């Protein structure tokens, strides 16, 4: 893949896999960058939600407003710096799922410099102290697809502590046994 292929891609998806439980095909932590010729359905739905919210709120950013509310309430806030926040997201699908998002909304991760890097390092350290060194995990950067006017990037961190079973696989319903508020409290102390 050359840089022009990457620039033309409908969606770019950066992932990091750690551990066999996280589906890693290699025995060491590794990152991969995918340049997809289409926008995945989950990203397209998110793009639509961002657009609908901006229309209803005269241009406000959905994730930007959620971040402001999480900072105000502090229940699920783990850490904050000048550029980004580290949260245990409301409605997390899995135990110890985390999100890093910019304090000021930006559509594309790649347009913002090292935003979130310090908090990502902090998040991984907190998870290691709480769950043990190098817990199996996936992380990915959700960034705006081509042509998305309203969007906001984020980094999702998903420790792989539970296995998907019949409920999750058969219905798409997630059963999270650790409340995000509990995760935030534990990781603030880690």
Mark where each language-model region is:
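HIT superfamily nucleotide-processing domains
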Residues: 1-190
